[in-house]
Amino acid sequence: WFVAQLRGIDLRAGFREILQIIVQELGLRILAEEQAKKPIATETLHTSMLSESVQDELPYSFEIQPFDDGLLAYWAHYGIYEDTLRRFRVRSLKSYRSQTKEGKPFELKASPTEPIYAYIGNGYIKIYRPNSSKMRFLYGGRMPSPYCFGMEQLPSKGDMLFLTGGEKDVLSLSARHFHAICFNSETAQIPERIIESLQLRFRHIILLYDSDATGLREAQRQVGRLAAYHVKQLQLPLKGTKSEKDISDYFALGNEEADFRGLLNTLLSQMYTQTMMLLRSCEIDYDNPPDASKSLVAV
């Protein structure tokens, strides 16, 4: 009945349609006959939310090469090791071929000084070339909208979830036993429906954006937009320069997991202090109760 009212569907005439909506949005494995006609690659709730629309498809192909010490050294600088890379489907590429939006084909080949790393998704790929001044980030396939990295690796329940500015930050946090995701960029609009779903799974959702001007501005904007979901912001004690602005830089500078937990404890203490102050304002001193209210009109 509730779904019928919400979608404006007649309960009797559209009963089967209502069932299909419930099955699709809850990721239920029923109505096998209908699913056989319309095969779905991934049947989880979070994936369906992230695949409502896609950008134009760009054809691509690539050749994977094994990680060696040189290729792993870049990630090890941030405390990210091969087990974390594999869990998030990060690969090293020997070559990558695609075409521009205008249809012009091109090929990139990795070298010791310009490695090519790939974040491999379902039907799409994001290329990362950290040492390249041009074409540093590339996309191939059908990119989901919104793009969200790390969603598949999240547990069903957790204490804290961090919203970061990039994939490397997600990997840095995961390598230290923290849960994190990122969208396409810090300036991307975070869908409220996703935050609403995550709020049911995590006790605290914390924005952990860069400490530069853009990151601080966007963090404040998102905190305002998502105030109804009690999203908080944690500002890192960094200078905000190119080499000292995000959580990956924070760990690369020598800070440990325990140092980061200290920042979190300070943030949570401030949150709970504010809550206790609000609660105390509602307390009644029974030894000195307030005066009884007086009626303005006596009958």
Language-model segments: residues:
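Short, aromatic/basic amphipathic alpha-helical patches
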Residues: R217-A228
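Terminal peptide-recognition signature
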Residues: V3, W75, G165, L173, ...
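Phosphate-handling DNA/RNA-contact segment within nucleic-acid enzymes
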Residues: S95-R201, A219
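Acidic beta-strand-to-loop metal/phosphate-binding motif
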Residues: L163, F202-T214, Q235
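Short Cys/His-based metal-binding microdomains
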Residues: W1-I21
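Short, acidic/turn-prone active-site loops that include or flank metal/cofactor-
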Residues: N184-Q189, D210-S211, P237-K239
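TOPRIM metal-binding catalytic domain and adjacent DNA-binding surface shared by DnaG-type primases
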Residues: F15-P115, M151-D159, N265-D285
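P-loop NTPase catalytic core of nucleic-acid-dependent motor ATPases
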Residues: L279-V299
